[in-house]
């Protein structure tokens, strides 16, 4: 997951944007959650949330936040209903963890049964680990694009190496990788080789 799609245009050679949903979707399906709702922690991630919800046939909730300054939220509001729902927040990265912790706490206050988060890139700077541990999040699922600084009971890691290996194999053999970009055509080899730590 690129932080902004426009980054793809800054390379001199053709670049394919791979989406982490390919590795996260099997994990979400394995949870077998009823009353599932996908959420975005901010307006900028709404496109990602809608992509997940389309595949999972779920509702969508968007968090609207206002900041006083960088990494400090002054106000957050939910657009949508989470009462009686199992919510999964999806984002491309988690830095200080403030937004996700705030969103999870707000959703639990509004009646969510459980709140999980899926973030591709776990930067986890500052007091992020403590914020996650002390938040209403049931668990945080991340990829291994950035190694974790420490282990914690709430954080699970899903490896993206099977996805990369499959795409490199496909490119090397001059076959199409378009299936890697569609949520509903997740490659069976990748799904079967995904590991969770």
What are these regions (language model features)?
Residues 2-197:
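PRPP-associated nucleotide enzymes
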